[in-house]
Regions:
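Post-signal peptide N-terminal segment of secreted/secretory-pathway proteins
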Residues: 64, 68-141, 145-147
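Sec-dependent signal peptide hydrophobic core
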Residues: 5-13
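N-terminal mature-domain "stem" immediately C-terminal to a signal peptide or N-terminal signal-anchor/transmembrane
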Residues: 39-74
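Conserved small/polar residues in nucleotide/adenosyl-binding loops
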Residues: 217-221
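Amphipathic alpha-helices that form helix-helix packing interfaces
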Residues: 63-70, 89, 96-103, 159-162, ...
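Internal, well-ordered alpha/beta segment that forms a basic, Gly-enriched binding/recognition surface
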Residues: 125-176
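Long, flexible, surface-exposed domains enriched in hydrophobic/aromatic residues
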Residues: 208-216
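Bacterial Sec-dependent N-terminal signal peptides
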Residues: 1-4, 17-46
Length: 221
C-alpha cells in the first residue's frame, strides 16, 4: 500500500525538478527563446504548485506552529512545575514531531540547502555533552538570557540541538517524565533548544511560503 501512496509524491517531486530544469534551460538560452510555457510545462507547473501549496506549505506551517507552541508550554512548565504541564509539553512535542516526520518525505529545498535537517534531527544525542552542559554554569546563564535561542543555535552542536535533546529532558521510557525528575536547569536548556528548533522550522515555512505567511513576529534570523 505504501508504494502506491508514495506515487503522487514522487510524481510531484519529478514535476518540480523537471519544470525547474526546463525553466533553467530557457534562462540559459543565449537567444532569449520563447518565454511562453509549453502545454507540458504548464501541466508540470500545476502539479508543482499544487504539491507546494497543499503539501509542503501545509506541513511546514503545522510544524512551525507546533514548535512555537512547544516553546510557550515549556516556559509555562518552568513557571509552574506540575505533572499536567509536563504532559501538555509532551503532547505538543509529539504533535510537532509528527509534522516533522511527514516533512521527511520531501527533504529538498530549504531543509537541505540550509542544513536544517541535521541541525534539528541529528542522532544519536550526545548525552555526555548534554550532561556536561548541565554542569556549565556560564552556559546555563547564557541559556537563561533573552537571546537564548540564538545562543543555542550558534554555540551548541547539532548533537545537542533539535528534537532529541528536548525528548531526553521530557520523556522517560517513552512516557512523560515525572515533574519531580526534571531540574530547572534542564528546562532552561530545553527552552533554549526549543527556541532554536522553532526558528529553524519558521525558516522552512518562510522559504516555501514567504515571510508574510508567518505569524511569529519575533522571529530571529
Amino acid at each position: 500500500m505504501k508504494k502506491f501512496l508514495r506515487f503522487p509524491l514522487y510524481a510531484a517531486m519529478a514535476a518540480i525538478m523537471t519544470f525547474n530544469f526546463s525553466a533553467c534551460s530557457d534562462d540559459d538560452d543565449p537567444d532569449g527563446g520563447d518565454t511562453e510555457l509549453s502545454e507540458k510545462d504548464k501541466r508540470y507547473q500545476a502539479i508543482a504548485d499544487q504539491f507546494t501549496k497543499n503539501t509542503v506549505i501545509v506541513t511546514y506551517t503545522g510544524l512551525a506552529d507546533q514548535t512555537e507552541a512547544l516553546v510557550e508550554k515549556l516556559k509555562a512548565l518552568k513557571a509552574d512545575k506540575t505533572d499536567d504541564n509536563v504532559k501538555s509539553v509532551c503532547e505538543t512535542f509529539l504533535n510537532a514531531r509528527a509534522w516533522w516526520e511527514k516533512s521527511e518525505a520531501f527533504l529538498f529545498g530549504a531543509a537541505s540547502d540550509f542544513g536544517i535537517d541535521p541541525h534539528i534531527d541529528s542522532w544519536p544525542l550526545d548525552l555526555d555533552g548534554l550532561l556536561d552542559e548541565m554542569k556549565n554554569t556560564s552556559h546555563i546563564t547564557a541559556m537563561e538570557a533573552e537571546d537564548a535561542d540564538v545562543w543555542a543555535g550558534v554555540k551548541l552542536g547539532p548533537e545537542l540541538l533539535g528534537f532529541h535533546g528536548i525528548e531526553y529532558i521530557m520523556f522517560e521510557a517513552g512516557s512523560p517524565k515525572a515533574v519531580s525528575k526534571i531540574k530547572d536547569k534542564e528546562l532552561t536548556y530545553a527552552i533554549a533548544v526549543a527556541g532554536d528548533l522553532r526558528n529553524k522550522c519558521y525558516q522552512l515555512q518562510i522559504s516555501w511560503a514567504g515571510a508574510d505567511t508567518v505569524s511569529y513576529t519575533h522571529l530571529r534570523a
